[in-house]
Amino acid sequence: QKPSFSLPIMRGLQVTGVLGVTLSVAHSSMMTGMPLRIRQLQRIPRSHCIRSCAVSATQSPPKKRKQKGSQGGGRGGGGSGGGKGITSREADYSQWYQDVIAAGDLTDQSPVKGCAVIKPTGMALWDSLRNELDQRIRKSGAQNAYFPLFIPVSFLSKEAEHVDGFAKECAVVTHHRLRALEEGKGVEPDPHARLEEPLIVRPTSETMIWYMFSKWIMSYRDLPLKINQWANVVRWELRTRPFLRTTEFLWQEGHTAHATSDEARQCAEQMLDVYASVCKDVLAMPVVKGLKSPTERFAGADDTYTIEALMQNGWALQSGTSHFLGQNFAKAFGVNFQNANNEQELVWATSWGVSTRLVGALVMSHSDDVGLVLPPAVAPNQVVLVPISQGPGKAPEQHEELMTFVQKAVVAMERSNVRIHVDTRFSMRPGNKYFEWERKGVPIRMEVGARDMAAGTLLCARRTGGEKFPLALDDSFGAKVVAELEAIQQALYDTAEARLHACTFEVESYAEMKDALEGSDSGGASGFFLVPWFDDAEAEAQIKTETKATIRCFPLDKQHLTEGRTCFYSGRPATHIALFARAF
């Protein structure tokens, strides 16, 4: 079942967590305190997690205006009913995700395993996200550049930890041309065209960029140097899933060099905040900011900062990382600078990036069993307008009058910077159009027929549900549409934030967490588990083997809570508060 609510979310909300704990709150903004502290964990169905880790408010059923021959609910309320061909989240969450991607027309399979085709709608989502993020990256002082796709294999071996981290994922180029076989039987690598040094198809660009930094940085006057690039990378994956894990993916990677350690670390933390703000403001997705454990940090980094998001099934999704690289790459590539005292010093470094994985996070955070649900801030089309007409061939005068009315509405919305699409497929039944746009997640659907035009209104349906409502085409029409979009954006964030709080648990013993996760294996729910932890790589590996849960991070705002507490696994004095979860 999809969560439904009236906008905006008001007093009297109830949030039920995956462990069966129900909170009644006066307002969603109150749900910003400490996570629930659970002593006895209950086994409950996974379906409860998907349904109840959301905010709901009592509402009357929508009034429907029937459309003869329509499908997908006719002119009924938005976001209602089940999606044909979409597996429910309760039945199979993984298949549901695949089905929603297909129904939303986001990707298609290519003949190359692990390399998906991102279709126009999927690319439009990435473009919206990229444009917003690029503005914030530029404001941080970074400049865009582009570096080669191919990296000499010797570069990768300059930083020992880095090569260990990526060696098994690298695609290698060994020849620079092909030759035709006899009798037209195809082509093969030309044995006379073997490269003197093999090239790596970039899995990430630290080595190439630091080689270039060694040429560009000479003096303290050259610092800080902040470079960003938008590119594709290749990491050979055996198990792939659209957007979440693919062999080739699109991303943004930033690389900076600084005169001091403090300045570099401050930059890494600043970019983590940028990523978290984009997730909140654009994707309507709350995240937990933290440090990775030593076993999970980026290869070649001193510290890795991460943002972790909670998906509807209680699993975590790493949504962005920012790395404090220390002087490791500066040493490997000899990047020195002359300071103000004419002394030579090594620079300090960071790197940071997010990828098209954020599109997958968006889909998993908000979508339902009908299809996509898109936050207005990132939706390629924020409004779809469906004129109810038989087309210009029948009753041309009435059609022309209707389309003039539609154009006035379009102009009013465009003046308010609303992204709008008018569906003029008049040979298609309106109900089929409604169903299609629901599956594609457009935040607001507007319908206008003769009755609406006579009343000077457009009939609106929110993708997130609730009663349909008329909106008068007057001087404030554009502003009212913007207000509705803002309310939808906020409601989606409030729902996701409520889920995060309701599905985050503090436990004091390993048995509690293990029992809860074992319950999820037989149909129960998962979640985030905050635990006191003593750093121990072997214990971390053992827990992963037994439960499939890993340390997602050490939350930055919880590390002061270790005093006087013992590790939930070993009983030794706690060194951190760790967040464990199963993860995509």
Residue ranges of each PLM-predicted region?
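NTP/phosphate- and nucleic-acid-binding module
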Residues: 44-584
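N-terminal chloroplast transit peptides
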Residues: 1-41
